[in-house]
Amino acid sequence: MNQKPVVAYSSQFALLLGFLGVGLILSGLLMSWLTAVLLHVPFLQVPEALMKPENVQFSRFANALTTFVAFFIPAWAVAKIASKNAFQTLGFNSHINIKQVIAVGVISFGALFLSGSLSAINEIIPMPANFLAKARKMENEYQQTMITLATMKNMGDLLLGLLVIAVAPAIFEEVLFRAGLQRVLVGLTKNAALGIMISSIL
């Protein structure tokens, strides 16, 4: 951990931002292209097609795939450039113990209450009316998408839904922010607490 990286942390940070931008663009294009080709709809009708109940399974897998491209690939690419073993650099290992499992459960449970409190605080912060209207519109669209994706008719749907719309995207997001961005920021600032704080804010 104390060894000097092959690629400077400042360069890794720039690469990560660049790859993230490219990943977000490619994931959006990939989602639109796959939807248009597989569901036989024009590009302009892709959002409506993804919201239809009969296309919910496709939407789930497409969401997981695009999240993988947008979040996981950039972090993996930077780690691959910076070291020989990308997965080890990202923090993946085969060792796990019961303390880690319990810690994850406790943190996740606590985060539920914290997110609710932060949401309430966010509501009382004064914001421009046009910004609030735009933010609420985006939130409503997101909630509608989540409701569509979360439609589950049986236990198989439940398990598949949890894997595709919850577990997989959460893992890919954590790889980007914790294993990718946080690792680089800690190395860049040479301060673990500061690097973790900055990545948490972002």
Where are these regions (language model features)?
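Transmembrane helix-loop junction
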Residues: 79-80, 120, 183, 187
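Juxtamembrane helix-loop-helix connectors linking adjacent transmembrane helices
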Residues: 46-53, 88-168
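Hydrophobic alpha-helical transmembrane segments
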Residues: 13-18, 61, 101-106, 159, ...
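Juxtamembrane transmembrane-helix termini
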Residues: 38, 42, 123-126, 186
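Hydrophobic side chains within alpha-helical segments
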Residues: 66, 70, 119-120, 176-177, ...
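Transmembrane helix-loop-helix hairpins at the membrane interface
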Residues: 114, 151-202
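Aromatic-enriched alpha-helical transmembrane segments of multi-pass intramembrane proteins
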Residues: 63-73, 146-157, 192-194
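N-terminal, membrane-interfacial amphipathic/helix-forming hydrophobic leader that caps
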Residues: 1-101, 109-110, 116
